[in-house]
Amino acid sequence: MHAKSLTELRAALAAKECSAVELAQLYLKRIDAARDLNAFVHVDADLTLAQAKAADAELARGAGGALTGLPIAHKDVFVTRGWRSTAGSKMLANYESPFDATVVARLQAAGMVTLGKTNMDEFAMGSSNENSAFGAVKNPWDTNAVPGGSSGGSSAAVAARLAPAATGTDTGGSIRQPASFAGVTGIKPTYGRVSRYGMIAFASSLDQGGPMAQSASDCALLLNAMSGFDERDSTSLEREDEDFTRHLGQPWAAGNDAGKPLAGLRIGLPNEYFGDGLADDVRASIDAALKQYEALGATLVPVSLPKTELSIPVYYVIAPAEASSNLSRFDGVRFGHRAAQYGDLLDMYKKSRAEGFGPEVKRRILVGAYVLSHGYYDAYYLQAQKIRRIIAQDFQEAFKSCDVIMGPASPTVAWDLGSKGDDPVQMYLADIYTLSVSLAGLPGMSVPCGFGASANAKRPVGLQIIGNYFNEARMLQVADAFQRATDWHKQVPAGV
């Protein structure tokens, strides 16, 4: 039962093969047995079972919706009433929010049962989930490897079937890269599609929440509940609600032959995503996935995203600048860690922040403060914003000749734990294919498409699918067609 997808679990609940309480108990036992993975930072069985009992009551009345009674885990960047909300930081180690984030509230309103809070890189700053104040997360496929970051706890939980689904956030790739590393499906929606209210902020113009699950169809179900306008989020976009499952299982164009359901689909392949730096085993898996798409009727079209290489310096100017502002609120006065011993007020600020923040967070705050300082603002921050607009324009030019863009989610498979901690630049380079999508505000997702070679044979590879603004339903259709023809997303780590 634990290996079933959300769609399959929904059918099991409808057929009364299990109850919501039994499902919750099953996953709670699995979470407890897999503590070594360190995927969860906070679990409260009483709270979980209370929600499950309420869901069973709804189902018994013949009420409830598509998600009622189904379990989910939440990345610990979403504040939750009743559970601690830490953002992976000592600064918030004991913080309990008086309210739920909109994402959490909407999923609970849809009847989902919260299993707990998942581990993450501190304040979502990292690509390996080694920056958490609560310890590194291990990749269920190979426990010597990282699970990706910053949503590494969520990706590990879904991969190890400790939860059938989880929420994540993506600022520069933090849903797509860990989904790739852990062999699960994850989607970053268009910026503004999902409310950021109650999401502890890293970089406000980039942060976006999204679902992680076994399949594209599961992600579509979750996105139905998560998305929508929220007046409490000034960046939330007011659009008509839509059903993200509406194209699943349908041909790309009416009248397509059953054997070629994607005939007419044009897949753009950026030259810049297949150059130097792409590992051979990742390239082989991506090439095989693209051949599968051709077999389904799609056409491959070369495109260019010439500013791809600039996405890293642009991101690491803009994101730290916004982080330095957002994290200024954590001063030991209003909430968060406060130093036990200090002199005057200024000394209390300094010591509280020095003790509460980890090394990577401090590094990015310093970088952000520097690029915003007098004499450097124009040279760095404003220049980065100008290039950001050009990056978005490059995508729009590419979409004139294709419907979706594809390539690797990461240039390599997951690396060994501890292997890149001393070289942050190498860690930053791992996000080369995801950063530009975030800078442009476009939707993107990762779907499992293979494994690495030889020594990396247990480490998954993810195919990134990028859509135009608000084109998530079509993007999910394209991913779903691939998953109907392959079984990469159904494979599980040994022992699971």
Curated annotation (Swiss-Prot):
Under InterPro entries, the record lists: Amidase, Amidase_CS, Amidase_dom, AS_sf, GatA
Q: Which domain of life is it from?
A: Bacteria
Please give the Gene Ontology molecular function terms for this protein.
Answer: ATP binding; glutaminyl-tRNA synthase (glutamine-hydrolyzing) activity
* Any one cellular-component term (Gene Ontology): glutamyl-tRNA(Gln) amidotransferase complex
Which residues does the Swiss-Prot or TrEMBL record annotate as the active site?
A: 75, 150, 174
Q: Give the GO terms filed under biological process for this record.
A: translation
The UniProt entry, under PROSITE patterns, shows:
AMIDASES
Q: Which reaction does it catalyse?
A: L-glutamyl-tRNA(Gln) + L-glutamine + ATP + H2O = L-glutaminyl-tRNA(Gln) + L-glutamate + ADP + phosphate + H(+)
Disulphides: none
Q: What is its EC number?
A: 6.3.5.7
Which keywords describe this protein according to UniProt?
A: ATP-binding, Ligase, Nucleotide-binding, Protein biosynthesis
**Database matches in SUPFAM superfamilies:** Amidase signature (AS) enzymes
Q: How does it assemble?
A: Heterotrimer of A, B and C subunits.
Annotated family: Belongs to the amidase family. GatA subfamily.
Q: Which HAMAP family match?
A: GatA (MF_00120)
Q: What does this protein do?
A: Allows the formation of correctly charged Gln-tRNA(Gln) through the transamidation of misacylated Glu-tRNA(Gln) in organisms which lack glutaminyl-tRNA synthetase. The reaction takes place in the presence of glutamine and ATP through an activated gamma-phospho-Glu-tRNA(Gln).
Protein name, per record:
Glutamyl-tRNA(Gln) amidotransferase subunit A
Q: What is the lineage of its organism?
A: Bacteria, Pseudomonadati, Pseudomonadota, Betaproteobacteria, Burkholderiales
